[in-house]
Amino acid sequence: MAAEPNSTPDGPLWVVIAAYNEERRLGETLKRLSPYCGNIVVVDDGSHDRTSEVALAHPVWVLRHVVNRGQGAALQTGIDFALRQGAGVIVTFDADGQHCPEEIAQLVEPIRAGRADVVLGSRFLGRAVGMPLSRRVVLRLGVLFTRVFSSVRVTDAHNGFRALSRRAALCIRITQDRMAHASEILDQIRLHRLRYCEVPVTVRYTEETLAKGQSSWNALKIVGQLLLGRLIR
């Protein structure tokens, strides 16, 4: 049994997973993750497959959206649930197995030590195994967009592996239902003057995860969603 990262005085560690049609990969992800955290909530975002059934076969909480609302909405549902359970630190973790649960301890350490409110995993400080050049270019453009519009200096703007203190989780409200939520979180870090840092993490790409990931066209749509959000704010 792996050692679970220490909780903060504010409460225990929780992991939130947003899952949509992940019956093939979710089981292995939960099997690898469980030794590193005893409090896991999976939010099935209106899947059409057996995602909920797979999750229920593991010692985790399972919530379900009746319709697919997008990853941002699913994460907010999970974060709200974890906060109600008394979470002191919340880690968001992808359902597809791209992230390494062994790295949770280093992700939460700056929060546990009182040095940060938000810790962002960076594949560009760590390793991006199997990442194609096209994906690297799109992600670098995302970093540039973030620096221009949010004034938050990061090396990896769209990594779903992050940790939030209880204070940060209570401050940040995800209103972008879909993938634009990652940039929105960075914007709210600046808005609420939250302390943040990055730590190196590993992201592993496979043909399957690349096929389900964000295309260049989707990246442009994310930019459009964020710009629209700024105009109507």
Task: Write out the residue ranges for each language-model feature.
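N-proximal low-complexity "stem/linker" segments adjacent to membrane-targeting elements
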Residues: 1-31
